[in-house]
Curated annotation (Swiss-Prot):
Gene assigned in the entry: sucC
Pfam families: ATP-grasp_2, Ligase_CoA
One GO cellular component term noted in the UniProt record for this chain: cytosol
GO molecular-function term, one example from the UniProt record: ATP binding
Pathway(s) of this molecule: Carbohydrate metabolism; tricarboxylic acid cycle; succinate from succinyl-CoA (ligase route): step 1/1
Source species taxonomy: Bacteria, Pseudomonadati, Pseudomonadota, Gammaproteobacteria, Moraxellales
NCBIfam families: PRK00696.1, sucCoAbeta
Native source species: Acinetobacter baumannii (strain SDF)
Identification of the protein by name: Succinate--CoA ligase [ADP-forming] subunit beta
């Protein structure tokens, strides 16, 4: 689960981190009032969406007058912002931040942290190249990224933060400020089950103070049950509608950009199914794992979610019956096809528990379903059907 910038800043501020002050506005009148509250001379206005690249997409603007504020608010609020991190539809802009103008600054740094699966530790990253996409820095000048792995038994140590501060070229009081910021960030990360944390830029102002100008926070969704305050910050309008619907039925669904819908039981088999579709020249439209304990109702809903994607031109159902019986899956497929007006080819591959009975039910249903005898056969048939 992602947080908006204003939510992330409010959370980090609770841990004593210095953040750029800003006021949330949902319309032009509120934006003007916020502008005046901040002095009425200069302010930075930022669209609140769960995506990076807002500046290049027109989602950030410096306002020097009320007219600038009104124009930006009216043009951006209740529209959709398309950035390099969104799909073609973009993300809905329901609000903006009117923030204090902290420029000019002396330097812009970067500070971030992730859960590194290879080291199985929280890993901090810092760079002197703040204010730009960190992915670009990592690709072009990886030597400019400083990494620190944190031992979970002892936590982040002050000496580690000081070493990063020295590497960033900070001096005197700035070192102490940075140590406090990095330690507070680690505390916030652990206590709120962050999956991702990013301050870009972390600005060094002309008076020497260090300030978090932007904040990006992602929360581990599996931990939300124990984080009621954080869970209440969830903005469902920023999430894919199909993924949101899938979560209500405990379905693991991720929307992709292809045209072949996939329904599989088991994450590994789902990945293999997408791979073999690509191998035969197709493009998967989604990842969908109905799980080992799939019920008839969940399978029907999964079918509906797949077909709700208008780009889907064919569906591959790949079920290996273990805990899930293939005859139950077959009954669910028949019910779903009868309930939903299916106009695209559907290829079904059933193996394992009651596979023969499942295949018999499908054959006797009278529906136009394409049977497959193996994974390769299924992929070849669905790709051919889509291209026909």
């Amino acid at each position: 689960m992602n947080l908006h910038e204003y939510q992330a800043k409010a959370l980090l501020k609770e841990y004593g981190m210095p953040v750029q002050e800003g006021i949330l506005a949902t319309n032009a009148d509120e934006a003007v009032a916020a502008f005046e509250q901040l002095g009425g001379k200069f302010a930075v206005m930022k669209a609140q969406v769960h995506a990076g690249g807002r500046g290049k997409a027109g989602g950030v603007k410096v306002a020097k007058s009320k007219e600038d504020v009104i124009e930006f608010a009216n043009n951006i609020i209740r529209t959709r912002l398309v950035t390099y991190q969104t799909d073609a539809n973009g993300q809905p802009v329901n609000s903006i931040i009117v923030a204090e103008d902290v420029y000019p600054v002396e330097r812009e740094l970067y500070l971030g942290a992730v859960v590194d699966r290879s080291s199985r530790r929280i890993t901090f990253m810092a760079s002197t190249e703040g204010g730009v996409e960190i992915e670009k820095v990592a690709e072009e000048t990886p030597e400019k990224i400083i990494k620190v792995e944190v031992d979970p038994l002892v936590g982040l140590q002050p000496f580690q933060a000081r070493e990063v501060a020295f590497a960033l070229g900070l001096k005197d009081k700035q070192i102490g400020q940075f140590v406090k910021i990095m330690t507070a960030a680690y505390q916030a990360f652990v206590e709120n089950d962050f999956a991702l944390f990013e301050i870009n830029p972390l600005s060094v102002r002309e008076n020497g103070e260090i300030l978090c100008v932007d904040a990006k926070v992602g929360i581990d969704s599996n931990a939300l049950y124990r984080l009621p305050k954080v869970a209440a910050l969830r903005d469902k309008s920023q999430e894919n509608e199909r993924e949101l619907k899938a979560s209500e039925f405990d379905l693991n669904y991720v929307a992709l950009e292809g045209n072949i819908g996939c329904m599989v039981n088991g994450a590994g088999l789902a990945m293999a199914t997408m791979d073999i579709i690509k191998l035969y020249g197709g493009q998967p439209a989604n990842f969908l794992d109905v799980g080992g304990g799939a019920t008839k109702e969940r399978v029907i809903e999964a079918f509906k979610i797949i077909l709700a994607d208008t780009s889907v031109q064919g569906v591959l159902i790949n079920i290996f019956g273990g805990i899930v019986r293939c005859d139950m899956i077959a009954e669910a497929i028949i019910a779903a096809v009868q309930e939903v007006n299916v106009t695209v080819p559907v290829v079904v591959r059933l193996e394992g528990n009651n596979a023969e009975l499942g295949a018999k039910l499908l054959d006797e249903s009278g529906l136009k379903l394409i049977s497959a005898n193996g994974l390769s056969d299924a992929a070849e048939k669905v790709v051919a059907a889509v291209k026909a």
